[in-house]
Structure formats: structure tokens, C-alpha cells
Regions:
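Catalytic domains of carbohydrate-active enzymes, especially glycoside hydrolases
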Residues: 27-40
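Structural preference for beta-strand elements that scaffold enzyme active sites
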Residues: 7-11, 37-40, 64-68, 136-137
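Extended, intrinsically disordered, low-complexity segments
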Residues: 89-112, 118-221
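Acidic (Asp/Glu)-rich catalytic clusters
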Residues: 32-33, 59-62, 130-131
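Short, acidic/polar
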Residues: 19-30, 118-128
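Active-site-adjacent beta->alpha loops and helix N-cap segments on the catalytic face
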Residues: 1, 21, 45-62, 77-81, ...
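Catalytic beta/alpha-barrel core
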Residues: 39-52, 70-71, 91, 113-115, ...
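N-terminal small/glycine-rich loop or linker at the start of catalytic domains
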Residues: 1-19, 73-75, 89-100
């Protein structure tokens, strides 16, 4: 059915209600036929069925279509998958009287059967979505932003709290050493060795180097 498009206050035209998925499919097919080798589709929630429904419609017309999917930190993964687990339990006829679907993020549910089932769904999400929706590559946008913010929050709480410097040593440096993380020798990772080689090349024994036998990085083996 043809409709006269209505212009929004922003100056853009509103899509006809209910056509959003159809438009995604059309755009994906057109992009592939124009030379694209991978698709990027955003979804409202990380739901394997929803992703697969869209991609499989694209593959009906372009059977080799492959998808890049953003495992986005914008999703509340815990809440979304607890809701999915809750709905699955209801569909299976299980007793869900111990849970309030509107409050599934509550810490009181963290070690429950539902929470464990939800975590298992998260654990297999990439494999499930790759199998069902032909996802070629999963990525996480902004993982370093969130991990840095979390770790600095934890470090600040400990460092300015009762643990003092132990907060850094126990949770950062010792972990780097035990796990063989190269960045524990941050001098080398920042290029000080290269700088020393450069100085030595031009100044020989007169070079004032950052490294050498007394370099603190030699404390790490």
C-alpha cells in the first residue's frame, strides 16, 4: 500500500510503521549486490532468534551473506538474558514464582537457577549466533573504555582506602607478573630500549640511556 510520507520536525521522513525489518533486508541485499562483503546489523537486544530472522531473510536472496555483529556494551546483557531465560522457563512450564521479571537485575537472583541459565546463554551466544545467523565476526565496541573505568574505580577505592599500595600490587602488578603480561615492563613497551639503541648509535659510551644494568625493569623476569 502506497502512503504519502510525512515529514518530521527534524526534516526527515518517517518510515511506514512496521517496515523497519523490511528496510534492513532491502538495504543489506542492495549493499551486497553493490560490492559489500560483510554486513553490519544493529538490533535492539542481543537475541539470537531476532538476528537470525533478519539475516536468513537476506540469505534467501544472497546465500553467501555474512554478518559482523556488535556485542555492544550498550546492551544490559545480564538483564536481557535473564529475561530470555525467564521466558524460556515459562514456555517450558517451570515454576517461576520465585522471580519478579521486572526486577531480574536484583543481586538476590545472582546465584539462582535462572541466573546460571542466563549466564550459560551469554557464554554460548557467539557460537549460537554464528551457527543460526551466519555471523562471521563478533566484536565489542568500547571494551577498553569500560574495563579501564571499572579497574580505575576499584583501584581508587582500595588505594585511598584501607589497602593503600597493596590495592595496586595485588590486583595489578602481581597479576601482570603471574600471567606474563608484557606491559609489566612498561619501559620496554613504551620504546625506551629503542631510544637507548638510538642514543648509543650516535653517542657511543657517552650516551645517557634510560636502561642499562640498573634499569628497574630488570627486577622483572
Amino acid at each position: 500500500k502506497l502512503l504519502r510520507p510525512a515529514r518530521l520536525a527534524s526534516g526527515l521522513f518517517e518510515f511506514a510503521p512496521g517496515t523497519n525489518i523490511d528496510r534492513v533486508v532491502v538495504d543489506c541485499v542492495a549493499s551486497l549486490r553493490a560490492g559489500a562483503d560483510l554486513l553490519w546489523i544493529e538490533t535492539a537486544t542481543p537475541n539470537v532468534k531476532d538476528i537470525a530472522d533478519m539475516v536468513n531473510r537476506v540469505r534467501e536472496q544472497e546465500p553467501t551473506a555474512k554478518l559482523v555483529y556488535n556485542n555492544s556494551p550498550s546492551f544490559n546483557w545480564t538483564l536481557n538474558f535473564r529475561q530470555q531465560a525467564y521466558d524460556a522457563m515459562v514456555a517450558e512450564g517451570k515454576d517461576v514464582s520465585a522471580y519478579d521479571r521486572a526486577k531480574l537485575m536484583s543481586v538476590e537472583y545472582d546465584n539462582t537457577e535462572l541466573a546460571l541459565a542466563a549466564d550459560q546463554r551469554i557464554r554460548t551466544f557467539q557460537a549460537d549466533a554464528s551457527r543460526e545467523a551466519n555471523i562471521f565476526h563478533h566484536l565489542i565496541t568500547l571494551p577498553t573504555y569500560h574495563t579501564t573505568a571499572l579497574h580505575m574505580n576499584n583501584l581508587a577505592q582500595g588505594y585511598f582506602g584501607e589497602d593503600g599500595m597493596l590495592a595496586y600490587v595485588l590486583n595489578v602488578q602481581r597479576e601482570e607478573i603471574r600471567k606474563g603480561v608484557a606491559c609489566v615492563k612498561h619501559q620496554a613497551m613504551s620504546g625506551s630500549d629503542i631510544g637507548d639503541d638510538h642514543k648509543e648509535f650516535f653517542a657511543g659510551e657517552a650516551a645517557l640511556k634510560a636502561g642499562g644494568a640498573k634499569n628497574t625493569s630488570n627486577q622483572f623476569h
